[in-house]
């Protein structure tokens, strides 16, 4: 078998913007900076917002709706 064909698999630190530091193993070779993690992501913290962007149909109906009608 060939020797030294696999990349190094070392411990690195993934630092989140909230201050959380996570020790993980990776082949990247340097520490990572994360925007969100499990402690600050809105889905996991329960502070999720309902973003209703609406589509083209909603925008059309809003623009051309008759005032006083349903």
UniProtKB/Swiss-Prot annotation:
Matching InterPro entries: Ribosomal_bL28/bL31-like_sf (IPR034704), Ribosomal_bL31 (IPR002150), Ribosomal_bL31_A (IPR027491), Ribosomal_bL31_sf (IPR042105)
Q: Which domain of life is it from?
A: Bacteria
Membrane-crossing segments per the record: none
Name by which UniProt lists this protein: Large ribosomal subunit protein bL31
Stored NCBIfam families: L31, PRK00019.1
**Which cofactor names does the annotation list?**
Zn(2+)
Task: Provide the Gene Ontology terms for cellular component.
Answer: ribonucleoprotein complex; ribosome
Q: Quote one Gene Ontology molecular function term.
A: metal ion binding
What does the Swiss-Prot or TrEMBL cofactor note state? Binds 1 zinc ion per subunit.
Q: Which residues bind Zn(2+)?
A: 16, 18, 37, 40
The entry assigns this protein to a family as follows: Belongs to the bacterial ribosomal protein bL31 family. Type A subfamily.
Subunit relationships: Part of the 50S ribosomal subunit.
Task: Answer yes or no on keyword Ribosomal protein.
Answer: yes
Write down the Pfam families for this protein, in alphabetical order.
Answer: Ribosomal_L31 (PF01197)
Instruction: For this UniProt record, give its keywords in alphabetical order, as a comma-separated list.
Output: Metal-binding, Ribonucleoprotein, Ribosomal protein, RNA-binding, rRNA-binding, Zinc
